[in-house]
Amino acid sequence: MVGGATSEGGNVWAWARRVLALPERDGAVEEALAAAEPDGHGLTALPFLAGERSTGWHEDARAALTGLGLATTAPDMLRALLEGVAFRLGAVYERLAPLASSDHTVVATGGALARSPT
């Protein structure tokens, strides 16, 4: 068994909802995220709020969000951060895929992932 760990998923979601004062469970944020064009916000996010685990293992890495403007919204920032998380998961997968058999199974865990409707 091979794997790669990240600390970004649920931690980024919880941090962004708290800091950006987004509602917890009304569904409006999720609807706005789903309706938004991928990368339509013009932001770039490095979601390393707790350092980086896979693939570089840089514990001192920190998050960054660039491209902010007067029209940037809280959901834009959350979307950019979550896209950064997805990019990180893709990077882990790219590293692991050559080591796996052609009929491999990807297993993802975590509270936020388990509660996600999609």
Per-region residue spans from a language model:
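Active-site core segments that coordinate phosphate-bearing ligands/cofactors
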Residues: 1-118
